[in-house]
């Protein structure tokens, strides 16, 4: 968790509530993603870092630059959000604002991102079966990402939010070794 999470939360919540009220959650998610990309561009990121916590002529020029780059890609409401963040010296929270907005959106839509780590790519049948089982257990729609980790001998590790299910062969062997040493 970033140092900016607590600062970003009210902005993310207000953005989420507004987007939900306008029935534009996906549009706002996309626009905030664009804003993050712009804000994390090296030149702009350096300027944001130097303008953190203050509202100066330099920060106004920075806002104008961000708005110019985002022009046509974000709506007037997101432009207003950029201005409010700048006025409060909070442009540095853009990434955390986006992450929190995404979490609120996923919670509202009952979606959970799941990372499945294995030693090799799962087959489509395995993905389908695992997705169905996880959706039943978690009572949410699963958005699965597969990660290949050559250090796993076999099995899989599933991460869904704060929950980790470690079904890797490495962990099973370590448990067995621990049980044998305990005897």
UniProtKB/Swiss-Prot annotation:
Keywords: ATP synthesis, Cell inner membrane, Cell membrane, CF(1), Hydrogen ion transport, Ion transport, Membrane, Transport
Keyword Cell membrane: yes
Disulfide bridge partners, by residue number: none
Gene Ontology, cellular component aspect: plasma membrane; proton-transporting ATP synthase complex
Gene Ontology MF terms in the entry: proton-transporting ATP synthase activity, rotational mechanism
Membrane topology type: Peripheral membrane protein
Localization: Cell inner membrane
Its job: F(1)F(0) ATP synthase produces ATP from ADP in the presence of a proton or sodium gradient. F-type ATPases consist of two structural domains, F(1) containing the extramembraneous catalytic core and F(0) containing the membrane proton channel, linked together by a central stalk and a peripheral stalk. During catalysis, ATP synthesis in the catalytic domain of F(1) is coupled via a rotary mechanism of the central stalk subunits to proton translocation.
Subunit-structure text: F-type ATPases have 2 components, F(1) - the catalytic core - and F(0) - the membrane proton channel. F(1) has five subunits: alpha(3), beta(3), gamma(1), delta(1), epsilon(1). F(0) has three main subunits: a(1), b(2) and c(10-14). The alpha and beta chains form an alternating ring which encloses part of the gamma chain. F(1) is attached to F(0) by a central stalk formed by the gamma and epsilon chains, while a peripheral stalk is formed by the delta and b chains.
Family the entry assigns: Belongs to the ATPase delta chain family.
PANTHER family for the chain: ATP SYNTHASE DELTA CHAIN
NCBIfam families on file: ATP_synt_delta (TIGR01145), PRK05758.2-2 (NF004402)
Name of the protein: ATP synthase subunit delta 2
Organism this protein belongs to: Vibrio atlanticus (strain LGP32)
Gene name per UniProt: atpH2
């Amino acid at each position: 968790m970033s140092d900016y999470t607590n600062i970003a939360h009210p902005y993310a919540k207000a953005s989420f509530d507004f987007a939900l009220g306008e029935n534009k959650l996906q549009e706002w998610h996309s626009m905030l993603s664009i804003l993050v990309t712009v804000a994390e561009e090296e030149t702009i990121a350096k300027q944001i870092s130097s303008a953190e916590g203050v509202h100066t002529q330099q920060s106004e020029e920075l806002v104008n630059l961000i708005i110019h780059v985002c022009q046509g890609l974000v709506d007037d409401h997101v432009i207003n959000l950029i201005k409010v963040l700048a006025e409060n010296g909070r442009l540095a929270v853009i990434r955390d604002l986006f992450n929190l907005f995404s979490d609120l959106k996923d919670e509202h839509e009952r979606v959970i991102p799941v990372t499945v780590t294995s030693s090799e790519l799962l087959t489509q049948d395995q993905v389908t079966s695992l997705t169905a089982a996880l959706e039943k257990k978690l009572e949410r729609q699963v958005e699965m990402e597969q990660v290949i980790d050559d250090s796993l001998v076999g099995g899989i590790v599933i991460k869904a939010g704060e929950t980790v299910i470690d079904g890797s062969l490495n962990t099973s062997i370590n448990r067995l070794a621990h049980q044998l040493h305990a005897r």
